[in-house]
Amino acid sequence: MTMIRTRFAPSPTGYLHIGGARTALYSWLHTRRHGGRFVLRIEDTDRERSTPEAVNAILEGMAWLGLDYDEGPFYQTERYDRYRQHLQTLLDAGQAYYCYCTKDRLERLRTEQQARKEKPRYDGRCRDLDGPPSEEVADEPVIRFRTPLEGHVVVEDAIRGKVQFLNSELDDLVIARGDGSPTYNFTVVVDDLEMGVTDVIRGDDHLNNTPRQIHLYQALGFEPPRFAHVPMILGEDGKRLSKRHGSVSVLQYRDEGYLPEALLNYLVRLGWSHGDQEVFGVDELIQLFDINEVNHSASTFNPSKLQWLNQQHIMRAEPNHIARHLGPFLAERGVDPAEGPALEAVVRTQQERAKTLVEMADNSLFFYRRPEAYEEKAARKNFKEGTAEILEHCQHCFSGLPSWDAESIHGVVTEAAEAFDVKMGKVAQPLRVAVSGSAVSPPIDATLELLGREETVARVGQAAEWVRQNVG
């Protein structure tokens, strides 16, 4: 069996967005499952809109997602000689011809066809000419492909099944502009055949290009690759996903605290499923994903579901993995994890509740930095008359503990509740506010164990003093 070769071919006119990332993921999974090769090609022929910054953003996004490629990146702007050679091959074989029609003539033709409620298409005026016509001659002729006038093209699509196109519905495609630069439909065919691509997986907005490209493959003497056109992604309003729905850069999801494996998990489920299973690891996806099982219907992007999946992956991941991703978020907040509790230990206390790494970073700050103030609502609810005495009692007991561990700390909290004849919460909550500045933290015994005896005693004493000055 021929080795499977797929490609991801983004245009560097913007960031790597959700739709592009899903296409790349489907191609990558299909390749990895079958032990093939994944090729990265940058389609940068639009010189006005293509930027180095966009290329870097695409490469960075793929690296963050872990979508490694085996060959490339190849750049179309470095391949013009190859395109010119294949253009000449088609011209020499009579499969392509020069079209001298002016823009004005083509616009008049379009207007007349629309007035007759006909599909706008080239009328073949220059198709059988040996040279320029006698009038209305363009300064720079384009090159058109000589599309068969009769018959049909069948696209055997892995997702949509058999799709048939009548040749009579296809006009003679422009494959090179007046300045000699090749057009998209031509370059993509040349690239795919020269790079040995066997399976083209792309968005279904390219389906209508496929019969034209199949003609080009055949004219150049090559078998077309297999095709799979994945359905579009919709916003929750049923319209095509765009920036207004949150169709943002993949890297923005990174910056908002999503794990790459969570985003991959969500993207693969936008069109594919495996029974009722919701949460998948990347290795598991490589084993299970089948491009033939992708649904042909459009999928709806649901930010809440993505966040839920992110929480699931945070809960299930190894603490050292989370710590590697969490470190940069703490650094952004001016925190050096080396100057406090072990980051993996902090992660363990947060994994059950954090929805994003941003949330986890914000909730972890107090482990490395004393609170500058107490949240007003938390202080009002938990710092009451008599709280100072409870805090001072705990402070004294903490100082004298023979060992500093969660069990011993829990014993102090229990003993204090009994000594002051209050419920456990009347001790634990003031302690929580005292050390974290808020009423929300991991279990108090685990929290204090991580903070350490010296820091705990200092913060509890500081809070007791604050209560005496502000509450009484």
UniProtKB/Swiss-Prot annotation:
The keyword Lipoprotein does not apply. One of its GO terms (cellular component) is cytosol. InterPro entries: aa-tRNA-synth_I_cd-bd (IPR045462), aa-tRNA-synth_I_codon-bd_sub2 (IPR020751), aa-tRNA-synth_I_CS (IPR001412), aa_tRNA-synth_I_cd-bd_sf (IPR008925), Glu-tRNA-ligase_bac/mito (IPR004527), Glu/Gln-tRNA-synth (IPR000924), Glu/Gln-tRNA-synth_Ib_cat-dom (IPR020058), GluQ/Sye (IPR049940). It comes from the Bacteria. Its cofactor is Zn(2+). A motif ('HIGH' region) lies at residues 10-20. It comes from Halorhodospira halophila (strain DSM 244 / SL1). Its EC number is 6.1.1.17. Its main location: cytoplasm. This is Glutamate--tRNA ligase 2. It is found in: Cytoplasm. Residues 112-130 have a biased composition (Basic and acidic residues). GO terms for biological process: glutamyl-tRNA aminoacylation.
